[in-house]
């Protein structure tokens, strides 16, 4: 049986995470011969999280805490490093904790990964729900970040 780990970074938005986990749970229930675990990377949230109930289709949900707020990409890197030390999984699925990524697509990702285990399967978000101001500021942020990396 193949094991997939769903890695989700979260910062303060525990309610969205709970809704996301319920939605993921509903979407993985019909996937056969696959085991799902979930790693939640807490990006040093300032809001306490209430207990997360493990939905029935997950083998486990583990929260890994970062010492300081480092942002979404660092959370993913931290989670991947944490998982690399375990090596008891076959595939990794990265999802945002804000609900922007569609759990309905997990089945497609799993199907593709199982069809050809030697390849990496990636998905691209076609449409973001943020408005034009956010998109403009995000582009400026990316430019400034790239400028800092190159300098």
PLM region spans:
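A conserved acidic beta->alpha catalytic loop
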Residues: 42-51, 99-100
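Donor nucleotide-sugar binding loop of glycosyltransferases
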Residues: 13-17, 45, 102
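Short beta-strand/loop segment that forms part of the nucleotide-sugar
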Residues: 32-45
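Short, well-formed alpha-helical segments that are part of the catalytic scaffolds
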Residues: 13-29
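Short beta-strand-to-loop acidic/aromatic patch adjacent to the donor-nucleotide binding site
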Residues: 88-100
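Short hydrophobic beta-strand elements that form part
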Residues: 7-9, 40, 65
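Cell-envelope/extracellular polymer assembly enzymes that use nucleotide-activated donors
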Residues: 3-5, 37
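Acceptor/aglycone-binding surface of glycosyltransferases and processive sugar-polymer synthases
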Residues: 66-68, 72-82, 100-151
